[in-house]
A protein has these predicted regions:
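Loop-to-helix entry region of an early transmembrane alpha helix in multi-pass inner-membrane enzymes
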Residues: 58-62, 66, 73-92, 122
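Membrane-lumen/periplasm interface segments of specific transmembrane helices
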Residues: 187-252, 284, 288, 328-338
């Protein structure tokens, strides 16, 4: 078979095959590294058991919650596999967007998205980031095809995956008014907006019914140290080599200036670059407001790639920058050093303390391998916890913090219980005092004293005992 001819003739099959080859090995070993993934699985199991809607976390992610509640006891590789399929859909739709815009080498642009470390990893575990992006890419393509009602439906589904997808509305409005008269743009906006509003209202109706308007509430989190904010917004998104590639690409644009030969695209889609800039800017600002996770920047990635592709696709250096992006998931990473929840380092890793946290610069293992070893380490810790938990023979409270969802799901799956022990993510001063008055001993897992102070402004330093060293 002529591979070059096959790639040219069947680009979507190339995306499907590469998605399967690169994702399948990572669908096992639990539902991911995020506690939210395990909380989601527990939530959909309760929805299936009770028939009553429940949020996995505020403000609700009803598309994923309701779909997964139809397969609540599916093994990890099945639920993770759905994320793989939605990641595949997002990549295919981005390819179709780039092709619709008449950009050269649209498959290359799609592969850059596929191999972005944060996107790659998020398409291998049970979480909603790539689900939302898949529907956003569908909405974008449908918008370019002037299918306004379907654009609205796809946008509503994206918001039903992640409510922050509503940011897509701002560049959408600008795009419509740039490409048509105010009268036509207003009509098109109505055709998009009505189904989007109806779909969003329908999807969030269960949350509104059960929780009232309070379903939007979440407790405030402290702002992370600036080095961590920078890391999560750069290396955490693109990997080490991806950051090198982005810096090189931006410097090329800066120094080449007017000598650049931007791609020639379809003039019927004016305002696309402004569309991309707005999407990037809004998601960067949103991330800076609450820089908790690198994955919050996933919706900006297709638009960043579009801008790079637009200005650099005809530059000789672009092939080199693309090569760095494509290897970024597999080689070199900067990771947390922690025996229970950190990654396993290679022999060539170098450790350094940054902002009070020990981190490892690993010259061999890339982000996807490091993420896999984190998942395995967390599984080992939960197994170690359960072994110790089963041996407790006195009345005890264990504050589990961010480990709670991992532990609860594992115990539920293995039908493990100890009537002597109360497990909780955290407790207020009043709750702890009540248990102490009933002769309960207070234990906690490492680092969870910080969690309890953040959420409840209290931790019993003098009475609490570390459960596992």
């Amino acid at each position: 078979m002529d591979i070059k001819r096959f790639v040219s003739a069947h680009p979507i099959w190339v995306i499907v095959i590469l998605s399967l080859l690169t994702r399948l090995p990572f669908l096992f070993h639990g539902y991911g590294v995020e506690e939210d993934s395990y909380g989601l699985v527990l939530t959909v199991q309760r929805i299936a058991e009770t028939g009553v809607y429940e949020m996995s976390r505020a403000p609700g992610h009803p598309v994923q919650e309701l779909i997964l509640s139809r397969i609540p006891n599916a093994p990890d590789f099945v639920m993770n596999g759905l994320s793989m399929l939605f990641g595949m859909l997002a990549t295919i739709m981005f390819f179709m967007v780039m092709r619709e815009l008449r950009y050269p080498k649209p498959l290359l642009a799609a592969l850059l998205l596929m191999m972005m470390p944060v996107f790659y990893i998020s398409s291998t575990y049970t979480i909603d980031y790539v689900w939302a992006l898949a529907f956003l890419m569908c909405a974008w393509w449908l918008l370019l095809k002037h299918r306004y009602l379907l654009t609205g439906l796809a946008l509503g589904l994206a918001v039903g995956c992640r409510v922050t997808s509503v940011l897509f509305v701002v560049p959408l409005v600008v795009y419509l008014f740039v490409n048509g008269s105010p009268r036509n743009a207003a009509k098109q906006l109505f055709l998009v907006g009505l189904p989007a509003l109806l779909m969003t209202a329908l999807l969030f109706l269960p949350a509104l019914t059960v929780y009232g308007t309070g379903f939007f509430y979440t407790y405030p989190l402290p702002y992370p140290p600036l080095p961590k904010v920078f890391y999560k917004g750069t290396i955490g998104v693109m990997g080490v080599w991806g950051c090198v590639a982005l810096a090189g690409a931006l410097l090329t644009i800066l120094f080449r200036g007017k000598k650049l030969q931007p791609a020639e695209t379809d003039d019927s889609h004016r305002g696309v670059l402004l569309f991309a800039i707005l999407m990037i800017a809004m998601h960067v600002l949103l991330y800076l407001r609450l820089p908790e996770k690198s994955a919050f920047l996933i919706p900006a990635l297709p638009f960043l790639i579009l801008l790079l592709h637009h200005y650099l696709v005809n530059e000789k250096s672009y092939a080199f920058w693309c090569a760095l992006f494509l290897i970024s998931p597999f080689f070199t990473s900067v990771q947390l050093v922690d025996k229970d929840r950190g990654s396993v380092a290679s022999p060539l890793a170098v450790n350094q303390v940054v902002a009070g946290q020990e981190v490892s610069l690993d010259f061999i293992y890339g982000p996807v391998i490091s993420d896999l070893t984190k998942r395995i380490n967390k599984e080992h810790f939960v197994s170690k916890f359960i072994d110790s938990y089963q041996k407790v023979n006195e009345k005890s409270v264990i504050l589990c913090g961010f480990w709670m969802n991992y532990i609860e799901l594992k115990m539920k799956q293995e039908k493990i219980d100890n009537p002597q022990v109360v497990l909780a993510p955290g407790m207020s001063a009043e709750e702890i005092a009540r248990y102490q008055a009933d002769s309960y001993k207070i234990f906690y897992l490492r680092e969870q004293e910080t969690y309890n102070r953040i959420k409840y402004q209290y931790f019993p330093d003098d009475e609490a005992v570390l459960f596992i060293e």
